[in-house]
């Protein structure tokens, strides 16, 4: 919040017409039921698996390998959209790592978001998913469907239901409005009311827009 306030010179604040956030993907943020990141909960700021996992976090490679082998054996259709791969830097392997290594943290997850989605959520208060992230590095689709139940439950029992819940939200495309800037933020930053905030984008997609 403070960074954005400092980035926009005061003389330009009244001319801001819209906001869009992009971030390197997939940077995973886990949320509790009250909308806070798990790392914001009391006593969890230093818990490794509650903290943001940056896009280049690669400790979940074993999970990625197992998921890819199973997806190939089952001929899961989503591989046609991912170039036939599942990276350890994506949502699914990272979530499996938390599930296996920190069940007490995993049990507190309500939602899992890519950073561009999380920041947009914080700006607007609206739970909006970016189709760019969801359909690629979360292995989902625009209609919020995910790989076959057999595939996800083949990785861990009950994982299909968990994964679908973690990625709930209103799916929108780049350029579509996710909501308007929250009133308390317009006051804090000295910006006009009702500024539209676009759906979050992946940084690589932004460079092509």
Go through the PLM ranges and name each one.
Residues 2-209:
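Glycine-rich phosphate-binding/catalytic subdomain of phosphoryl-transfer
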